[in-house]
Amino acid sequence: MTTRHLTITDIASTGAGIAYEDGLRVFVPGALPGDEVTAEVDPPARGTRSSVAQYVKITRKSPWWAASPCPAHVARPACGGCALGSLTPEGQAAVKRGLLERALAESGVEAPEPLPLVEAPHDAEAFTQGFRNKAVLYPGVDPEGRWYFAMYAQGSHFPVPESCFCPQTPEWMAKAAETAARMLSLSDLSPWNESHREGDVRTIVMRDGVDSEKPQRLFTLCVHGETPEVRIFVGKLAKKLMEEGITSVFLNLHPTPGNAVLGRHSLHVAGTDGIETTIGGLRFAVRPETFLQVNPGQTERLYAMALEWVAPEKDEVLLDLYCGVGTMTLLAARTCAKAVGVDIVAASIERAKLNAKRNGIENAVFHAGAVEDELPRLIASGIRPAAAILDPAFKGLEETVPAMLTALPLTRFVYVSCNPKTFARDAAKFIELGWRIERLAPADLFPGAPHVETVA
């Protein structure tokens, strides 16, 4: 190792700070953009120009530094949920805009200057408090043998005890997690250990039906397998949670190894069969596995921008690819002749159809299948969409999709991305095929996290 004095100018998706020196990219965990640090730097891995530093001390704090209100952020190890938690809103905005700009530059994409970051008002409590409609917590056991549920430390599978209550989530979630932990402490069940691949309880997932006329609260216990002990326990837990105001309880079975939060099968245990939430004036059903953005206020802004830009007209057909449970499909269907949604998750498509019926929308149709498989079928069927919405997962588009879309009579499309790097990669492909970016904007749906959405 060598001791280096570094200035942090960038941040990785993991939350580690990045410094550049003598052609070397140095990752510095725990450091923030604008920090000046003294660190011990490992030699670069063979064949690379990247290295990892062991943080020693900050010699000068970032000009954007601000004390975090969350005790889990300053714990050691710190919670991995909010790597940017010690930056001002202005600092976070600059960092997130920079993530998009650097991704575009690295891919050689010529684009107009991004519009200002779409963010919650700085004076709004929702910027940092109680804005999430979903929490995922992992089990831990303290030295006295008491269970707790918390978020993982950055880059690890260690649940940070101080993160049992996250100020970004509604208070009821911490109380429900505490109830589950207290009852598990008296049971014979054990936390799942990914390294040894043994144990019972893998995680809990809680979801809030925001904008509901009455509280709608969903609790899911995710376990490795449905043993007799698990069945008995979840029955007792569900009874207690229902007494405390939870309205829907599920048991999720996750028998396979890996980091996926939930398994494929969820069993309804008690209460309603899911909850509801409102987006853009429409109501959507929510179950444990339903994908929805976790920041309701920012979701409204994000979707409104996407729909304003794509501007579906009353005589047009619109494609919504990677449509999930049909949120933007149904919102767009209100102003176009026909909206067609495609998603690989069959359960999401079934929910999308139910959501269409729930909202009385008859001009939306849905297809279950991979986009790269369904597009040729749609083209062969003679569909002639004029506009499209693309909202893929973190990995972006499959390699064949840009050319398939170019073969359609599209006049425009909107791309909503959760990963600047894959967005920039895909944008470069579209530009090669003759498309151009007219405008784009970063959007902040995760205050405190090194994550940025993009609308283009």
Protein language model features and the residues they cover:
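Terminal RNA-binding accessory module
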Residues: M1-A75, S156, L319, D373
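Rossmann-like S-adenosyl-L-methionine
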Residues: T3-H5, S13, P228-V455
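Residue-level signal for inorganic ion chemistry
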Residues: A19, G34, C82, I204, ...
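Short beta-strand micro-motifs enriched in acidic
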Residues: A31, E40-A45, Y138-D142, R207-D211
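Extended interfacial segments that mediate partner engagement and assembly in macromolecular machines
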Residues: V56-P71, R76-N193, T227
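A short, glycine/Asx- and small/polar-enriched loop/turn
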Residues: F127-N133, E213-P215, P450-V452
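Short edge beta-strands and adjacent turn/loop segments
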Residues: E198-S212
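Short, aliphatic-rich beta-strand segments
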Residues: M206, E213-G225, R283-R287, A387
